[in-house]
Amino acid sequence: MIKVAVFGAKGRMGTAVCQAVEEAEDTELVAAVDSGGDRSDASGADVIVDFTTPDAVMDNLSWAISHDINTVVGTTGFDDERYQVLRDQLADHPNIGCLVAPNFSIGAVLMMHFAEQAARFYESAEIVELHHPNKVDAPSGTARTTATKIAAARQEAGLGEVPDATKSQLNGARGAVVEGVHVHSVRLRGLVAHQEVLFGAEGETLTIRHDSMDRVSFMSGVLTGVRGVLDRPGLTVGIEGLLGLE
C-alpha cells in the first residue's frame, strides 16, 4: 500500500483527493492536513499530494523534500524560477521525486497534446479558458502550459507571429499574451474547468475543447501521479510521461 498524505485537505480538490485515496485499493490515507495543521502528521507518508495555495506550496515542498517524502503537486503558481528551486532542493535528495502538473485530468492532458500537434499546421491560434469564479489565478496554469507548447511547435515549424491587425482596443480586450499566443480567461458561476484551443487557416478553423464538469475527473490523473512519482526521482512536470505521451 502506498501511504498518502494530503495537504489542503479541506479544499475542494483536497477533499476529492482524500476520498479517491481512501477508495483506491493500493493507497492508504495516513494524514489530511489543512491550513494551520501540523505537517508532522505526514511524516510517515510515502507521497504527499499538495493542493494548497501558491503562497504555501513552496514551503510545503521544502519540508517534504527535507523529510525525504515524494510529492505530487496540483497547486498553481509555478514558473521557471520555482522549478529551478525545486531542482536544486531535489539534487540533495536523489531518491525523491516531485511531480508538478498543471492539470491532472486525462482529457485535459490529451487536449494539450492534440493542440501541440495541431499548432504547426495553422497560422492563427488562440486559447479560451473558463473556470469557476473562486479560482485565484488567470490565465490558468493549463492555459499557460498550452500556450507554451503551441509557441514551441510554431517556432519549430517556422511559423511567424500570429496575424492580428488590431490597432485600437479597450484594455484587455485581446486577452493576455503568453509567448505570442493570446489567452482569454472567463470566470463564471456554474463552471468547473474548461478550455478550448482555436486554430485558424485560410477557409477553415479547428477547435479542440475539454470540459471538466466535476472534480472527480482529476482523480485518475492524481492517482496515476501518486503511483508514478515513486519511480521518477527528481522533478517531473506534467503527467504526459506517465501516460506514454512523451
UniProtKB/Swiss-Prot annotation:
Pfam families linked to this entry: DapB_C, DapB_N
Biological processes, Gene Ontology terms: diaminopimelate biosynthetic process; lysine biosynthetic process via diaminopimelate
NAD listed as a keyword: yes
Gene name of the encoded protein: dapB
Reactions the enzyme catalyzes: (S)-2,3,4,5-tetrahydrodipicolinate + NAD(+) + H2O = (2S,4S)-4-hydroxy-2,3,4,5-tetrahydrodipicolinate + NADH + H(+); (S)-2,3,4,5-tetrahydrodipicolinate + NADP(+) + H2O = (2S,4S)-4-hydroxy-2,3,4,5-tetrahydrodipicolinate + NADPH + H(+)
Gene Ontology molecular functions: 4-hydroxy-tetrahydrodipicolinate reductase; NAD binding; NADP binding; oxidoreductase activity, acting on CH or CH2 groups, NAD or NADP as acceptor
Pathway membership, UniProt: Amino-acid biosynthesis; L-lysine biosynthesis via DAP pathway; (S)-tetrahydrodipicolinate from L-aspartate: step 4/4
UniProt keyword terms in alphabetical order: Amino-acid biosynthesis, Cytoplasm, Diaminopimelate biosynthesis, Lysine biosynthesis, NAD, NADP, Oxidoreductase
Organism of origin: Cutibacterium acnes (strain DSM 16379 / KPA171202) (Propionibacterium acnes)
Compartment list: Cytoplasm
Positions bound to (S)-2,3,4,5-tetrahydrodipicolinate: 132, 141-142
Gene Ontology annotations for the cellular component aspect, listed alphabetically: cytosol
EC class (word): oxidoreductase
Function: Catalyzes the conversion of 4-hydroxy-tetrahydrodipicolinate (HTPA) to tetrahydrodipicolinate.
Transmembrane domains' residue ranges: none
Annotated EC: 1.17.1.8
Protein name: 4-hydroxy-tetrahydrodipicolinate reductase
Binding-site residues for NAD(+), renumbered to this chain: 8-13, 74-76, 101-104
Active site: 131 (proton donor/acceptor), 135 (proton donor)
Membership in a protein family: Belongs to the DapB family.
